[in-house]
């Protein structure tokens, strides 16, 4: 689970902190909290909504996590630049100071802090700690100087999971010496089969899922075809959401058809497609395929059905559904995981309600928070403009966050809890009135209107 995120000189963040730690002074919605196991553990919120004006930096919070996840999970070619974007509106930050990413996580009952500092050329510093509320223990610290010489400090510990306790300092130092300047030591350890520090890597790989407006969930077609429980969940939630959809199914497409040729052309653009068990293709805005890399290379297409006036099912292509229905479909694998998964899951969604009706967006949040009664080890973090969620009957004060652009262009992030509004306060009204910031300061739009209102600018002269 995500505990805390600290960002320096990264995207629009000059120095910012976001936290999922549950405040001890909050007295409402205690079932939203994932409880601490003991005095050394932390209590964590299961949900956070992040508000702010357009271009204030909400999406950059998601981008920062996405950047770190990609850097951890993927190796860069030796000469490739690190795709980091520093804070560009301060020349000192943009050209001379490295970006800094620090994340605190809870994984398999243990607390870790993992961080790194980098520019486009190299990782200057990288570290991993395990900690409790009172103590911290260094596991490794890697440093790379401007001459690309890498050194690592290693600290043996018995606090790692049993299966990861094989601590061979000579081999780990050898791995550090072979770590390229643009490569994370954490990633290099995994590639060299040194699993001593695998916990944060496994968290980024198996626990964290990031969904942005262009994401396409890979489980949708596969789940419909092979997971009866997931299919039943879909066939309940879609009619209940008033989409008009009576059911979902997949159709097998032959490769020698026009649709098969479209999929084949798109497949040529994917490097090493045989390395993936499942390949999802989105061709323009109209066509979506899933390829299962089995013996037959099965090609699937998702189809919805609606009932006509004679109660007969009529098939529809996905592109014939509304944007809101398509987003709902894209979110259903996440919703299902949040409700039923026994594994730790953290979903970070950029603009969860961008095409959904406000009532439906609220219902999805309620569904996740109600599943908290079942003690699911899951979190949902979303950026949003959906003000229907700004309600203390629904959320805790420390579950509501705001981002605001400062005069120098940097993004500030803070919680509603900092303002300590009364529990009976209409926080939606106060937010729209600007009491908490994070709203746009608009100029005089009326002054932009043409002075001659009798003549349209589009009317031929």
What is the role of each PLM region?
Residues 17, 102, 113-117, 292, ...:
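Short, surface-exposed charged micro-motifs
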Residues 1, 96-100, 119-124, 295-301, ...:
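A short, compositionally biased
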């Amino acid at each position: 689970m995500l505990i805390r995120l600290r960002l320096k000189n990264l995207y629009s963040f000059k120095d910012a902190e976001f936290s999922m730690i549950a405040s001890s002074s909050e007295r409402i919605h205690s079932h939203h909290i994932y409880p601490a196991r003991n005095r050394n553990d932390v209590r964590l919120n299961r949900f956070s909504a992040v508000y702010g004006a357009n271009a204030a930096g909400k999406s950059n919070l998601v981008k920062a996590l996405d950047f770190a996840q990609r850097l951890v999970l993927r190796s860069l070619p030796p000469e490739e630049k690190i795709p980091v974007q520093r804070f560009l509106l301060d020349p000192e930050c943009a050209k001379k100071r490295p970006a800094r990413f620090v994340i605190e996580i809870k994984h398999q009952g243990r607390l870790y802090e993992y961080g790194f500092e980098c520019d486009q050329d190299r990782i200057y510093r990288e570290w991993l700690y395990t900690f409790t509320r009172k103590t911290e223990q260094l596991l490794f610290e890697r440093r790379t100087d401007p001459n690309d010489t890498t050194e690592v400090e290693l600290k043996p510990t018995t606090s790692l999971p049993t299966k990861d306790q094989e601590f061979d300092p000579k081999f780990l130092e050898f791995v550090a010496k072979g770590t390229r300047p643009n490569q994370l030591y954490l990633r290099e350890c995994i590639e060299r089969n040194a699993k001593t520090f695998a916990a944060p890597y496994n968290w980024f790989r198996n626990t964290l899922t990031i969904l942005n407006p262009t994401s396409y969930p890979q489980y949708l077609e596969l789940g419909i075809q092979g997971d009866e429980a997931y299919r039943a969940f879909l066939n309940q939630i879609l009619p209940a959401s008033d989409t008009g959809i009576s059911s979902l199914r997949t159709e097998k497409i032959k490769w020698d058809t026009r649709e098969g040729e479209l999929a084949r052309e798109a497949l040529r653009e994917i490097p090493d497609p045989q390395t993936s068990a499942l390949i999802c293709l989105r061709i323009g805005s109209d066509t979506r395929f899933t390829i299962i890399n089995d013996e037959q290379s099965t090609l699937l297409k998702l189809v919805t059905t609606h009932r006509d006036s004679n109660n007969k099912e009529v098939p529809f292509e996905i592109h014939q559904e509304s944007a809101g229905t398509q987003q709902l479909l894209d979110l259903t694998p996440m919703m299902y995981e949040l409700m039923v998964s026994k594994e730790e899951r953290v979903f970070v969604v950029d603009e969860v309600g961008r095409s959904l009706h406000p009532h439906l967006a609220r219902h999805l949040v309620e569904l996740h928070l109600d599943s908290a009664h079942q003690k699911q080890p899951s979190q949902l973090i979303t950026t949003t403009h959906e003000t229907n969620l700004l309600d203390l009957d629904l959320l805790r004060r420390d579950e509501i966050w705001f981002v605001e652009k400062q005069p120098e262009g940097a993004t500030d992030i803070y919680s509603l809890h900092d303002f300590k509004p009364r529990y009976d306060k209409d926080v939606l009204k106060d937010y729209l009135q600007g009491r908490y910031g994070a709203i746009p300061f608009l100029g005089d739009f009326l002054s932009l209107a043409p002075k001659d209102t009798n003549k349209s600018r589009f009317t031929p002269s």
